Amino acid sequence: MKILVCAPLQEAESKKIQEYFINDTVLIKRRPTQEDIDQVDVIVGNPHLDLNLNQEHLQALLLNSAGSDQYIKEGTLNKTTKLTNASGSYGIAISEHVIGMMITFCKNLKTYALQMKEGNWLPSKQGKEIYHSRVCIVGYGDIGYEIAKRLKAFDCHITAIKRRVQKELPYVDEVATINDLDTILPQSDFVILSLPQSKETIHIFNRDKLLKMKKDAVLINVGRGSAISNEDLIEVLNQGYLYGVGLDVVEEEPLPATSPLWSYDRVLITPHSSGGFVWQSVRNYYTELVIRNIEHLKNHETLENEVDFQTGYRKVVTYKK
């Protein structure tokens, strides 16, 4: 088997894959050429879409991203090619980022950081507590699961929004669907988006949904920037709504320097950095996932995290224990 690794792994992880599949040909190349693509059976990573990936010989594409929307478009891959995403890899890193944003807003850390530059000792007279708060997590895959797991340490009441209602989910007090948002948003102190991109999720948080939220709620997006309408968010912020907005993803990336979103004291923007291969937990999990899936492929077994080309979601969702 010929395996191409173009994922942004470090030398240790790349070497681990090479050593595990010592009897196979493993090519490590961050920027593969069309000639490379034309010769391999498996691609590990997200190859550039300018390359022709629609190849009958390509057995599997093992993405290093949780999202797969660019690769499920008709004609991008051959119908015989299996596609998997990296769900499970990012949850730990992103959940820490979310908690950090929540604490930053609740304890006014951004305000104090700005005051430090001026040598200004001015205690804030407002704040929020995460303890005993009501949290709505929209999109309960691995990232939502890891967020909920950590928030349980704060004794939060957690509502998970999924496509389909399930009787029980780990670390969740209540399970609902998108259709229930109008009822749940007015009750939620924190709303956290960890959605993949699909036709149904684009601008799901428009003016109507944003105004359904508590006026002093905190909104955080670590899923896809397209889930929130920037134009509507700016309008709502100008009306004095929302205590804080944490954005690790936005509609247009990088966010233009001219965007009004940069100017709000109660908005915290990070450059799509909550998850990524800089984090050891991400690299470790993804490397093990890749090894397992190549073994599954060789043994003609079902692949983990296989993507449904119709929905863009995983065919089977499992949660870590």
Tell where the protein language model's regions lie, with residue ranges.
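Rossmann-like adenosine-cofactor binding region
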Residues: V165-P260
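Glycine-rich, N-terminal phosphate-binding loop of Rossmann-like dinucleotide-binding domains
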Residues: P47, S65, L195, V222-G223, ...
